[in-house]
C-alpha cells in the first residue's frame, strides 16, 4: 500500500480542482496519439486518425480523453486503494482490449506535459513529485493484471 503525506494529498487534490477535464483530457490523449503513433492501433473504431489535424479534431478522441480524466478522478477519490479501484479496468485493458501496459505510462507522461504547460510556474518540483507518484500508482494498478 502506498503512503500519502498530507502535502501530497493536498497537491494532487489541488491539481484536480483546477482541471478542465474536457480540455486536458483531449489534449493529453491527442498528444499521446500524435507523439506515439503506434498507440493509435487501439482506437481503430474512432474514425480517421490519419494525421495530427484529424486526431486533434476527432470528437471521439476528445470524448475518450474526458473519460480517461474522469477515470483518474476515481483514483483521486480512492487514493488509499487505487489498486482495487482499478482492478476491473485492468482486466478490461489486458484481457479484452489487449492494450500494451507501457502505453499507460506514455499517456501519463503526456498528461504530465499538458498539466505542466497549463499550470506554468505553479507546477513546481514538489508538485511534480506528488503528481508523478500519483500517476505511477495509477499506471501500476492499470498494469496489475499483466503481472
Swiss-Prot record:
One of its GO terms (cellular component) is hemoglobin complex. InterPro entries: Globin, Globin-like_sf, Globin/Proto, Hemoglobin_b, Hemoglobin_oxygen_transport. Residues 3-147 form the Globin domain. Keywords: Heme, Iron, Metal-binding, Oxygen transport, Transport. GO terms for molecular function: haptoglobin binding; heme binding; metal ion binding; organic acid binding; oxygen binding; oxygen carrier activity; peroxidase activity. PROSITE patterns: GLOBIN. The keyword Transport applies. It comes from the Eukaryota. Red blood cells. Belongs to the globin family. Heterotetramer of two alpha chains and two beta chains. This is Hemoglobin subunit beta. It comes from Melanogrammus aeglefinus. The gene is hbb.
Amino acid at each position: 500500500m502506498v503512503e500519502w503525506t498530507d502535502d501530497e494529498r493536498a497537491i494532487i487534490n489541488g491539481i484536480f480542482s483546477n482541471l478542465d477535464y474536457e480540455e486536458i483530457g483531449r489534449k493529453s490523449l491527442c498528444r499521446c496519439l500524435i507523439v506515439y503513433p503506434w498507440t493509435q492501433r487501439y482506437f481503430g473504431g474512432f474514425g480517421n486518425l490519419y494525421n495530427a489535424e484529424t486526431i486533434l479534431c476527432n470528437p471521439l478522441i476528445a470524448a475518450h480523453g474526458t473519460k480517461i480524466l474522469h477515470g483518474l478522478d476515481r483514483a483521486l477519490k480512492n487514493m488509499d486503494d487505487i489498486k482495487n479501484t482499478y482492478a476491473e479496468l485492468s482486466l478490461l485493458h489486458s484481457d479484452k482490449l489487449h492494450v500494451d501496459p507501457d502505453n499507460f505510462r506514455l499517456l501519463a507522461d503526456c498528461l504530465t506535459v499538458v498539466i505542466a504547460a497549463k499550470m506554468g510556474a505553479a507546477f513546481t518540483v514538489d508538485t511534480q513529485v506528488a503528481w508523478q507518484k500519483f500517476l505511477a500508482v495509477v499506471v501500476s494498478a492499470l498494469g496489475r493484471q499483466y503481472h
